[in-house]
């Protein structure tokens, strides 16, 4: 293989050229390094800016998250303000939404309190809304109540009436009748609610004999049809007239409230014994002895004269509590109370240990029976199921005695007799607790007026048995005007005790003013 003919001298350079080349290379590297350094500094600056932007974005995001709940709260308030200020109902200065809100609030807290609460809310939120006065709110409630007194049932429906009368000051009583179609009863396992019921009649009166109640039953039956069933307490003036009612050839079946019946059984069983009377006497003395002492935590509940055996559970529970702490000297509740003081004021309860066990067991059976009826209703087979329920309760009671067994049998026998009155396949109710609840709601609304006899506020009673919505308000207030309300009050309530008192004082003031002018 031939070698190349190129000479080595052709690739040799002078030292000068080599140095110059190296210097040029160094300068180029330095310039490149400077450019890279400038790029690095620029990138660092950009990175710092991006970090600052990221930090600012994070802070803004945190601010948004912090303010979001307030924005969420303000948005509905803006919507509420819009709805409360929407178009007014014809003849009114307020919207249906505002009126419905006022009525619902008044049902819970009262008329004056509703006005005060709304004013505080509107001012706190800065809403540009005018709040109605308590008198206006009362007028709305009363008009809505009168409009609800209508026939809510179809001709072909089987209906259950519940009737009772409530006393007020003097001889005044009001007969209240509410109703529900059997097909609208709650499903087994559920309880009746006020909104399930319809107020059918509100009739004040000074006396309620059989003929008086019968007259009102007949008037209501002529208006909306007779009920298939009527449920009330054991008062003959309520029960006997109902037996004369009839619809489609079928007589109205009269049922007795389980709670009233159970209270009567309990009274006959223990209430007439000297032992129980002595116990009540000791309770009254104990109340006076401990209520202003360090034992005030053990003050017994006040004794009720009326319906005492319908409200005995609270008293028996107190007796159990006080008896328990007699033997718990180290408990926190007993701090500062010596054994000597406990025994001096409450030691007498030890003498009634066995009695309290028996009485409490009877009350527990009543509670279980009421719980069963209030969730299942009355039907064929109810008594058998109730017996099983009571057997379960008795498993956890101390040793049963004759009185406890008697109470169990009395409850089951009563339900057996009641279910035998039903038609095959029908299910009704055997508790008027919903009616008592309605009376309670009304008296709470009535508040200070309850000491002045029944007033025009009776017109508002039906509002507790309806779901008050803007749509309902829009419809009902167009049906009943203030003039219609005044006519209803004049016809139904008439001159009230409050109005008679006002007139008496007015005449007295005029007479006194006349005497003063003559003297001058």
Kindly give the residue locations of the regions a language model identified.
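Short amphipathic alpha-helical surface patches that mediate protein-protein
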Residues: 119, 142, 459-462
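RNase H-like two-metal-ion nuclease catalytic core shared by retroviral integrases
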Residues: 258-284, 429-440
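N-terminal membrane insertion elements
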Residues: 1-7
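A generic secondary-structure signal
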Residues: 28, 32, 60, 117-121, ...
């Amino acid at each position: 293989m031939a070698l190349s003919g190129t000479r080595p001298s052709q690739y040799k350079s002078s030292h000068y050229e080599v140095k110059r080349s190296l210097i040029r290379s160094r300068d180029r590297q330095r310039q490149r390094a400077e450019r890279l350094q400038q790029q690095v500094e620029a990138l660092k600056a950009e990175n710092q800016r991006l970090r600052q932007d990221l930090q600012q974005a994070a802070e803004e995001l945190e601010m948004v998250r912090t303010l979001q709940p307030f924005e969420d709260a303000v948005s509905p308030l803006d919507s509420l303000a819009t709805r409360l200020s929407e178009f007014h109902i014809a003849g009114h200065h307020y919207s249906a939404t505002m009126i419905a809100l006022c009525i619902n609030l008044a049902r819970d807290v009262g008329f004056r309190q509703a006005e005060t609460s709304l004013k505080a809310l509107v001012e706190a939120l800065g809403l540009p809304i005018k709040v109605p006065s308590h008198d206006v709110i009362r007028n709305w409630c009363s008009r809505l109540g009168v409009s609800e007194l209508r026939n809510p049932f179809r001709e072909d429906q089987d209906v259950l009436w519940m009737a009772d009368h409530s006393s007020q000051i003097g001889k005044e009583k009001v007969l209240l009748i509410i109703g529900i179609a059997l097909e609208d009863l709650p499903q087994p396992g559920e309880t009746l609610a006020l909104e399930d019921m319809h107020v059918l009649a509100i009739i004040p009166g000074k006396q309620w004999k059989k003929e008086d109640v019968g007259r009102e039953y007949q008037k209501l039956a002529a208006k909306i049809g007779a009920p298939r069933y009527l449920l009330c307490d054991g008062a003959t003036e309520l029960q006997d007239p109902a037996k004369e009612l009839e619809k489609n050839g079928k007589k109205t079946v009269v049922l007795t409230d389980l709670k009233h019946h159970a209270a009567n059984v309990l009274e006959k069983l223990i209430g007439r014994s000297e032992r129980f009377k002595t116990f009540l006497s000791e309770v009254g003395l104990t109340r006076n002895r401990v209520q202003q002492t360090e034992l005030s935590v053990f003050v017994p509940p006040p004794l009720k004269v009326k319906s005492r055996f319908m409200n005995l559970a609270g008293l028996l529970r107190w007796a159990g509590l006080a008896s328990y702490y007699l033997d718990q000297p180290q408990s926190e509740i007993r701090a500062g109370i010596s054994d000597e003081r406990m025994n001096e004021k409450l030691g007498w309860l030890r003498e009634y240990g066995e009695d309290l066990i028996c009485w409490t067991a009877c009350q527990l059976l009543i509670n279980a029976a009421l719980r069963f009826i209030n969730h299942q209703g009355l039907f064929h087979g109810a008594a058998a199921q109730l017996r099983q329920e009571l057997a379960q309760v008795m498993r956890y009671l101390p040793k049963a005695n004759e009185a406890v067994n008697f109470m169990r049998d009395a409850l089951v026998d009563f339900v057996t007799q009641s279910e035998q009155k039903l038609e095959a396949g029908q299910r009704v109710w055997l508790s008027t607790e919903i009616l008592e609840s309605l009376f309670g709601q009304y008296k709470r609304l009535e508040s200070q007026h309850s000491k002045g006899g029944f007033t025009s506020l009776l017109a508002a009673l039906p509002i507790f048995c309806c779901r008050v919505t803007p749509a309902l308000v829009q419809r009902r207030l167009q049906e009943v005007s203030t003039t219609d309300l005044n006519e209803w009050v004049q016809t139904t309530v008439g001159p009230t005790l409050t109005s008679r008192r006002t007139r008496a004082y007015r005449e007295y003031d005029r007479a006194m003013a006349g005497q003063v002018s003559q003297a001058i």
